[in-house]
């Protein structure tokens, strides 16, 4: 084991570094024909026509793990599957942060689960706000590095592309943060929307930076939000520790089977087509929205959404809702008291957004 890996494993809570976790019946590497080791029913439920649900699922379904590893360009030992990215975020905070001692650094306004998990664990929440610039709401990475060092951050979450701001972080900048915080913090890059950013994943940096981890999901570009398939990509040694901290059966069999089918070539080709459509539609709305009544600013985005400031965000929200269009009200988020986040839908759905907001001019 090299020194970099030693440094990363030293970030794990001391009381969990030798933690064995729970050994489930399915985790035992045994073969047989009559399975009487897990107290399961010998008969399928009448509602289970295929008869596949009476057995517990694989803790980490092999076919899915291999398919995801191939998709993300990593090896299966580098990958942990969980119930969406949320579970991976929670696992990281619980496994690394000692309550009352360690901190979790975030860059608000940003995805709220980082803060939720930190507070549930009793970890200090350290905030380095995004900076509103001509190029958008962007992470101040110098401040991130300095604050992480001075405030004892154990985890640094970089949402790239950022939700809801839409700004991205270049790989060389991510690498700079990981290098600066080597030995002190795990830098976690949340790439839930990276398919829309048209850049390589930060997973390409893992070989050189053991204190880097990457979150991926099938919920967005791959259109499997209900299946709750998220992945954490990191050093195999860290993945092994987190696996011991994870619940025994995190991935239901029907969800795993659906995801495996989605990762076949035909499914991936269709996903790529739809991502291209979303990117084109995002640029169409980015160009059209600034000319509509009440729109103050539209932020350029690398995700499948646009952050929009309005002269009267409540009125804009109500106008869209009256037209049957539901968007995300961001006014409770820091710096976003006048903003809504609009997901990029189908061309027809996006036309309804533009028509509803344009109608405000006619009404005026």
UniProtKB/Swiss-Prot annotation:
Q: Which reaction does it catalyse?
A: L-histidinol phosphate + 2-oxoglutarate = 3-(imidazol-4-yl)-2-oxopropyl phosphate + L-glutamate
Annotated keywords: Amino-acid biosynthesis, Aminotransferase, Histidine biosynthesis, Pyridoxal phosphate, Transferase
Q: Name one GO molecular function term.
A: pyridoxal phosphate binding
Q: Which domain of life is it from?
A: Bacteria
In its UniProt record, which GO terms are filed under biological process?
Answer: L-histidine biosynthetic process
List the cofactors: pyridoxal 5'-phosphate
UniProt pathway annotation: Amino-acid biosynthesis; L-histidine biosynthesis; L-histidine from 5-phospho-alpha-D-ribose 1-diphosphate: step 7/9
Enzyme Commission number: 2.6.1.9
- SUPFAM superfamilies reported in the protein's UniProt record: PLP-dependent transferases
Instruction: Please report a single Pfam family linked to this protein.
Output: Aminotran_1_2
Positions carrying N6-(pyridoxal phosphate)lysine: 220
UniProt KW Transmembrane keyword? no
Family to which the UniProt record says this protein belongs = Belongs to the class-II pyridoxal-phosphate-dependent aminotransferase family. Histidinol-phosphate aminotransferase subfamily.
User: Assembly and partners?
Assistant: Homodimer.
What is the name of the protein in this document?
Histidinol-phosphate aminotransferase
Q: Which organism is it from?
A: Stenotrophomonas maltophilia (strain R551-3)
């Amino acid at each position: 084991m090299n020194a970099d890996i030693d440094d990363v494993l030293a970030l794990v809570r001391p009381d969990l570094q030798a933690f064995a976790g729970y050994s489930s019946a399915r985790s035992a590497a045994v073969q047989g024909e009559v399975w009487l080791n897990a107290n399961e029913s010998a008969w399928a439920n009448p509602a289970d026509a295929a008869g596949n649900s009476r057995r517990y699922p694989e803790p980490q379904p092999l076919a899915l793990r291999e398919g995801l590893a191939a998709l993300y360009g990593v090896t299966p030992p580098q990958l942990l599957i969980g119930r969406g990215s949320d579970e991976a975020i929670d696992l990281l905070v619980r496994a690394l942060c000692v309550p009352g001692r360690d901190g979790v650094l975030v860059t608000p306004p940003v995805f709220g689960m980082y803060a939720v998990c930190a507070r549930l664990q009793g970890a200090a929440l350290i905030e380095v706000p995004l900076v509103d610039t001509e190029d958008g709401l962007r992470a101040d990475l110098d401040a991130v590095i300095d604050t992480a060092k001075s405030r004892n951050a154990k985890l640094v979450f970089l949402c790239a592309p950022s939700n809801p701001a839409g700004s991205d972080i270049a790989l060389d900048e991510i690498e700079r943060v990981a290098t600066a915080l080597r030995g002190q913090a795990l830098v976690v890059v949340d790439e839930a929307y990276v398919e829309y950013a048209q850049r390589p994943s930060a997973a390409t940096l893992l070989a050189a930076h053991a204190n880097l981890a990457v979150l991926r999901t099938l919920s967005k570009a791959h259109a499997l939000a209900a299946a709750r398939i998220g992945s954490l990509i990191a050093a195999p040694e860290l993945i092994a520790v987190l696996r011991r901290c994870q619940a025994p059966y995190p991935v239901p069999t029907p969800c795993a089977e659906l995801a495996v089918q989605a990762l076949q070539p035909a499914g991936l080709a269709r996903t790529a087509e739809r991502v291209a459509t979303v990117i084109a539609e995002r640029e169409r709305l980015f160009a059209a929205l600034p000319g509509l009544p009440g729109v103050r600013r539209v932020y350029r985005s690398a995700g499948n959404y646009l952050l929009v400031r309005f002269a009267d965000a409540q009125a804009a929200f109500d106008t869209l809702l009256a037209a049957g269009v539901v968007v995300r009200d961001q006014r409770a988020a820091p710096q976003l008291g006048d903003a809504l986040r609009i997901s990029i839908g189908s061309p027809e759905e996006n036309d309804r957004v533009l028509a509803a907001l344009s109608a405000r001019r006619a009404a005026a």
